[in-house]
């Protein structure tokens, strides 16, 4: 194992940020996994799981159990970690311009498609190597205008040629859930079973280029553009939502890290255990991200929930109220679709149009940008 420090572009004189990168195994030997924690810097359960994961991976590396190459960024957003506003941590949006740290990650698809045009054939192994080299070259050619651009670019360079990318996040109040590409449903189910996920949200494009899709979608698009070529989806990239922001127990973090380690074992990144355990039963079936129903406040007031994260909701069921503090009127909010309420806000004051909760339904068919701000 070794630790590398990557300096980010400076914002102002006297102020520096850097990324710490932990590496296990040997680059170029076997499958590569890239794991990063808390790109949304206030989603701190990811930071704790990363520490547990580091301990487990370091022990495995010392024992010669890392067959491939594992890159772990234990805190993926030093800029966001430093942001405080009125004594409150602000880690989701850049205070400089309000941009979401996990949106508009550079999309290398067009550059790579041009680089490999007419060069993909019937040899899948050769095709994967060619596309990976083109991805590395495209990422190396990116330039940054500010520290946040540089952050996204440096993280992308660490992960763009990986077989597996695990982007560790959490929600406000939530159960374990995952986001992934629709064609990679089987791998999402395997990881979801190990983690005990209660929702798995799938899409071919969620909008605004989040980090996981910046790594996986180039493969999907190239395969769509060149169906005659033998080109597998060679990067499995997923966003892992590690429950809610207050779920920071040590035992829970060790459990989640062990599940991620087991997934890496099953994918050949780590040596298999001497006595492999059977895959746990899946706690949910994947559903389309387009079917996820946002529960939206009809006006301002105090929020009262009738459902807890992880509970099933029936179509038409009352899930929350918003109580007007001028009139005392209680505005009930009913779900349109059936499914599990997998996340909700942690605060209890609503403004008109605020997203209060999310239900993993199957009947809606939303279009456009499918993720929240």
Predicted regions and their residues:
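Structured catalytic-domain cores with a bias toward divalent-metal coordination
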Residues: 1-373
